[in-house]
Amino acid sequence: MNASSNVSNVEIANKIASTAALFRKYFPDASVNFSPWDNTNESMQDTIDFAFHFPGWSPLIECRAILLQLRIENDNNNRVPKLLGIIMRGMIVPSERWRVATIGNWEMTGTHLPQKEQKDNLFLVCKELYKLSLIHI
């Protein structure tokens, strides 16, 4: 579900803004899109989705945009959902170039992987997302 559609209280709005700021800390040239899907995508209520667009194709990160999906568990007892995992996809329309998921081995796969420094920064983004209070792990 689009990050912009997931804001139901101040705490979630703060965590969504913090997620965007955290990503841009490591990739300052990226612009954030809080609504990467054309529709509300109601069937994907177990994710909070962002897209980060670069000013052109980046040979260092091997993509033009990154789709960031936070897999969440909504618990009515908590105002902020629990983070279950993170999926990032490096994209060049119309195809995926690489993917990393924090579920399992945290292994990056794909046909065109980012350079080592950018790859390390992507993993740092994931680690720091787990540190946000959005996460109850």
Ranges and model annotations:
Residues 67, 84-90, 120-128:
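Low-complexity, flexible helical/coil segments
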Residues 89-112:
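Short acidic, glycine/tyrosine-flanked loop/strand segments centered on an H-E-D-like triad
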Residues 1-51:
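Charge-rich, low-complexity N-terminal segments
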Residues 135-137:
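Conserved small/polar residues in nucleotide/adenosyl-binding loops
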Residues 30-85:
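Amphipathic, interaction-prone secondary-structure segments
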